[in-house]
């Protein structure tokens, strides 16, 4: 019974998505009992790359397809071969490819999405059989991926028309011509940059088409394993989110003290009515979507097991709950703020709120439509929801406002940042995978610099008050994060005793609060928290891992302590071991004992080094714990 109810709900929203795609320019026919598109794993489909791989795929899928699949195909064999060639390269995952069933011509998004339901399976058992053999993830994963991709296609067609690349090229050509006509050579040269096309490639998914599906999957797996081994304490580094969120809310006309007061209650579960409002706003559901890692800049197509392990990891380390709670609170505050402001005309709104709304093309007429909408009350608080706005276009603008402002407050990456971080390279190529390994964990910092700090510098001139608040608040919360991480390591808070050590402490807190937490320890002369050096950290965690392997090999040749290096490497690369609460117990119960066994006197020297470099002691000394 529950499965049937779930299928009806999914069918309802798939049908709504189909209608939105058609309204945007596609021509997708209605298919009875349609629930979701089939997922396809390029690596499984490609097999060994031989002609026999196509034969195996064709022989498996053909008896499971409904004959209606080939109703307009004069040559079913050729149709399947065309589909196979697209599936094995991953082209089917993008919004620009135009040939799923053998069509040709310029890339046309409307035509592309209209071909998405080419493979029609005979029944549910046939769908599941194919998914188990050549698909990726469970049916729920496929449903969410289908809705996400459909929403992306709708957004692209609404903004860029049915041929996004041609539309973008046309805009750029017209702007360059205008710049040349007014002899503005600098602007004309800037418009010749490849960056706009690189951003579009991220938006439409073509940047993720792997040059080699095997290489792309290997790189994605390595990066996922680095997350599982390195980010166990990331929630302790997330306290500066409070300041970044408050700064965003300030630019929406919400006083700072009110923002902080509401944020302090963010982790307290909300009532069912308020949770329904948050869901209607589309905020605080990252855990449900398996998308918590997105705020760290990850954008990987992971295999089912690795994906499930990653989602579990972020639940266990607390980041999933923290992210959902913070986004839910921010979204509710924005919606409540607009409801409270509904009695005012647009010119009477706070100037910062006006400026922010204008970024989403919300001005006098749109604001009048929004404030005329019926408000929804939950647990005694009124909210303005997009679904209540009568004009569909204005409702979409309001929804975009809520979603983007919440993402800005949580320092989530944008398409521009992802394009910048990938340097325009393609996934699954040697250069592309190298860049992605080097840039792992750095997109968060780039986003903070460009979105949060950039907002205070560039929007309507320098906002001195906003800049001062952001720096001071993130520094204070950065220090609190450092202190919590020290306590989790068994150490007392750092105690500077002169001007130089105070300066180092403030600088490290600024770095921690500004999104560079993994580099903060180096200002205290320490290696990073997993034992790698500064160069290894700058070059990405995988470079640090290679550095660790090199040290182990050198030690095995008699140039060091092989047992100690093996312990350090193993601890730093075992998934889930670095969960901050588990790591504390493991350190004192097992790891410190192993390190002392492998390198007698190691713990005493570590305590002395921490005292010498940081003037810091332990509230639970490792040397006492191993006696």
Predicted regions located by residue number:
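Low-complexity, small/polar and acidic-rich linker and loop segments
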Residues: 1-15, 36, 43-44
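Short linear, low-complexity motifs centered on an aromatic residue
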Residues: 24-40, 251-265, 455-462, 557, ...
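Long, charge-dense tracts
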Residues: 50-146, 150
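Hydrophobic, often aromatic-rich secondary-structure segments at membrane interfaces
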Residues: 112-236, 240-507
